Swiss-Prot record:
Alphabetized GO MF terms: endopeptidase activity; threonine-type endopeptidase activity
Protein name in UniProt: Proteasome subunit beta 2
One GO BP annotation of this record: proteasome-mediated ubiquitin-dependent protein catabolic process
UniProt organism field: Thermococcus kodakarensis (strain ATCC BAA-918 / JCM 12380 / KOD1)
HAMAP family registered for this protein in UniProt: Proteasome_B_A
Length: 199
């Protein structure tokens, strides 16, 4: 019997930075395992990834990216950009296409400029202003498409990202709607917060 898991993660890029948001519910088949899991992982102090798919695969890829970022910094004396990291991850995923990592990842960061990318399990790479992954992504992307503006502030983008994840949580049984993890990355660094809802 195939076990079903799910989540919703979103990313929004503005002129000021990048907002990543995700629900905090971990589910397995029809059971909620926890309501308090982090699905946005920092890779450097300026780049983070969202996780949708196999937890073990995501953790292995995150460790690889952390090591590559440290090696790049040591070798070249400057941080790896989010764009370079997205291309690196795309290559890693594509090299393993016969035994794929079962993940869908959003990379967001601000090193030289705000960058947002979406990667599929085979290494397909799309840079965009907004994106969503996971089982609730059809609901989240509708909210993002309706509310996104190129001139949004980071605060407006944060509110939109939370609304997109929360909307997905109300319609997708595998996405939680009680708490949303939010990471904002700007030229000033990375900030994480959790937005909780009582209802």
């Amino acid at each position: 019997m195939e076990k079903k898991t799910g989540t919703t993660t979103v990313g929004i890029r503005t002129k000021e930075g990048v907002v990543l948001a995700a629900d905090t519910q971990a589910s397995l088949d029809h059971m909620v395992e926890t309501l308090n899991i982090r699905k946005i992982l920092p890779i450097t102090d300026r780049i983070a990834i969202t996780t949708a798919g196999s937890v073990g695969d995501v953790q292995a890829l995150a460790r690889m990216l952390e090591a590559e970022a440290r090696y790049y910094q040591f070798t070249w004396g400057r941080p790896m950009t989010a764009k370079a990291m997205a291309h690196l991850l795309s290559n890693i995923l594509n090299e393993n296409k016969w035994f794929p990592y079962m993940v869908q990842i959003i990379i967001g960061g601000y090193v030289e400029e705000p960058t947002l990318a979406n990667l599929d399990p085979l290494g397909g790479l799309i840079f965009d202003d907004y994106t969503a992954t996971g089982s609730g992504s059809p609901f989240a992307i509708a909210v993002l498409e309706d509310g996104f503006r190129k001139d949004m502030s980071l605060e407006e983008a944060k509110e939109l990202a939370v609304r997109a994840v929360r909307t997905a949580g109300k319609r997708d049984v595998y996405t939680g709607d009680r708490k949303v993890q939010v990471v904002v990355i700007s030229k000033d660094g990375m900030k994480e917060e959790f937005v909780e809802f009582k209802e």
